[in-house]
Every structure is written in C-alpha cells, then in structure tokens.
A protein has these predicted regions:
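Bacterial N-terminal signal peptides that target proteins for export
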Residues: 1-8
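Bacterial N-terminal signal peptides
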Residues: 8-16
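N-terminal pre-domain segments of enzymes
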Residues: 21-82
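Sequence context surrounding c-type heme c attachment/ligation sites in exported
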Residues: 21-33, 97, 115-339
Length: 339
C-alpha cells in the first residue's frame, strides 16, 4: 500500500473507532490561563477565542453580540464577542454596564471591506483578571492568519467605506486606558443593558449566562434605524453617550471639562446646553457655548465633532476622519432646540 493511502486508511479507521465508541471530536477550549494569568500572550490565537480567526467564527462559550448604537471608528466594521468561563454568568446592574465575572473577556475586531475583500485590522481584548481589567491590542498580519500583540500600537494606511484615505491608528496599551478608564481603573465601556437588544439578553438569560433581564434594557435606539422622520434627540443623545461619555462623565478622562454626556444625564447644562467651556483655545473655534440652542454652527460640540484636525477633533482618539452621519444627527438635534 502506498504511504498516502496508508495514512488515509489509518485516519478512516481512527474516525470509525471514535464514532463506534461515541467519541465526539471537539475543538480545544478557550485558554482560561491566558485570560486570568499574569502574562500578555504574544498572539491572539493563544486565547482560543475563535475556531477560525479569519472568519471570526467563535469558539464554545464565546458569544457574539451587537450594540443598538455602536461607537464609530472611521466606518470600521466591529465584530464583538464576550467569553464567560464555564459556570459563570453576567450580572445586570440596572440599565448600565453589565458586570463580568473574573476570567471573562471582551473581544472586539475591527475590519474594513466586505465579502472576500474584508480585511481584519486589529482585535482588542479586555481581560478580567483578579486584580482588575487588562486591555491588550492585537494586529492582524497581511495573510489574515494571525494577530500579534501590539503593545506599542501602530498605523495602517487604508481607505474608509466613505472612500477617504487615512492613516488608521491602532492604539498602544496605554492609550486603551484613555477611553476604558473611570476613577483611574480600566473598565469596559460598551456592553450596557440600555444599549443591548432584549432578544440577545433574553437568549443569555435562557442559557444561564445572565442573572436577570434588567428594567431599562434596550432603551437606546437602534442607530441603523434612523431616518429623517425619526426624532433627533434620542439618536443624538445615544450617539454622544456611546462616542463621548466614556470620557465626558464624572470620573472619566475628561471630567474636568464639566460635560456629562451620559444617556441618563437630564441636566441641560451638564450636557452642554448654554455651557461655557472650562478652557477656551482653538478647540472652541471662537464659539462661546458647548451647545447653543438653534445654532449648531455656533456650538463648540459640533465644531469639534466635525473636524479631523488634531487638537480640535473630538473624540481625540479612535478617528482620523469625520462621521458625517453622526454630525448630521447632532446638528439636527441642536437646530431643533428652542432658543
């Protein structure tokens, strides 16, 4: 018998034996030690989050999820996942951020292009260790076969879905803390009950992965459903909550601005209406108020959103271009305010 045929025959016999004994060949489990240990794994594959990294096919106990209103990053597609260790579950805390057990992980991959042209750029992971959360960025290779740890970050030239050529920035490890920080501690910022679908949370509840369905769940609108006939205020407030409030809130990285752009904030002055900036400068564009009712073009908030120039642009990190759709919704919200 030729060697190749002998190997094939052996494989068939082995498979037949496994089937005869009721053995199911399962993919390797997620590497809990890589998540909870002290080391920083050099490659994304060491975690075992995906059965197929290129296809972003999640492994067992890795759950895909989506946000009603997602954070905008130069038009990148975001593929979001959470991993929960065996027997662990999420805990709902009102409409706010879900509480994750130690050993959990949050995974987010950034991609550009569609179909066969889709290119994975980076995957960011948040690891919940005993001492707190750790944020690590991983950069995908050109072959799309592996992502390697990029503690120093990096830049990639690419074209956005809007056709704009940009230098896309992968944040370094310390820059991850700029957004993922409150009161000096690294925290998740995305999976809040108010910004997750009731269907997804119901599925997690049924699977024993969520302790309860909290009141106030899914109160933020689905951004993809916005039309010119939609009320501007809830969409604008949701956009500001997701894109700005991780810094602009008490305890956030920009709390000294005095702005609190969280969804639940109801004080008009706190969200910028008729509020003068704490510190002026070219970032104010010569304007006097963060939000001037009825006058979007005289509002500092919109001026900074509508810029990609360093020192003016807001957010400071995570974008190299302007989100025209986001600007349009916030512009309409301000324009429709009573003077």
């Amino acid at each position: 018998m030729r060697p190749a045929r002998a190997l094939l025959a052996a494989a068939v016999l082995a498979l037949g034996g496994a089937m005869a004994h009721g053995t199911v060949l399962e993919p390797p489990p997620v590497n809990d030690t890589a998540i909870a240990g002290a080391a920083f794994p050099k490659t994304l594959s060491e975690f075992g989050f995906f059965q197929d990294g290129r296809a972003q096919d999640p492994a067992a106990r890795v759950h895909a999820y989506a946000l009603n209103t997602p954070l905008w990053s130069d038009g990148a597609e975001k593929l979001r996942f959470i991993y929960l260790p065996e027997g662990a579950r999420l805990t709902a805390d009102g409409e706010g951020l879900l509480q994750f057990p130690v050993g959990a992980a949050i995974i987010k991959t950034f991609a550009f292009g569609e179909g066969a042209e889709r290119r994975l750029i980076e995957t960011r992971v948040l690891l919940h260790r005993a001492e707190g959360w750790v944020a690590l960025p991983y950069r995908w290779n050109a072959e799309q076969t592996e992502a390697t740890l990029a503690l120093a970050g990096g830049r990639i030239d690419l074209t956005t879905p809007a056709g704009e050529a940009i230098s896309y920035a992968i944040p370094n490890k310390n820059q991850c803390k700029t957004c993922h920080s409150k009161d000096g501690a690294v925290i998740p910022i995305g999976p809040k009950a108010r910004n997750l679908s009731v269907k997804w949370m119901g599925e997690m509840l049924k699977a024993g992965r969520l302790d309860r369905l909290p009141p106030g769940a899914a109160t933020m609108p689905v951004w993809a459903g916005y039309t010119d006939q939609s009320p501007a205020e809830p969409f604008a407030r949701a956009y500001l909550d997701v894109n700005c409030a991780h810094c602009h809130q008490p305890g956030g990285g920009a709390s000294n601005s005095g702005l609190d752009l969280r969804w639940e904030q109801s004080d008009p002055h706190a969200i910028g209406i008729m509020k003068r900036p704490v510190a002026a400068g070219r970032g104010a564009g010569g304007h006097d108020f963060s939000v001037l009712p009825g006058q979007p073009d005289a509002s500092i908030l919109l001026y900074r959103m509508d810029s990609a120039e360093p020192g003016i642009a807001m957010p400071e990190l995570g974008k190299a271009s302007v989100d025209k759709d986001g600007v349009a919704v916030v512009r309409r919200w301000i324009a429709e305010m009573q003077r």
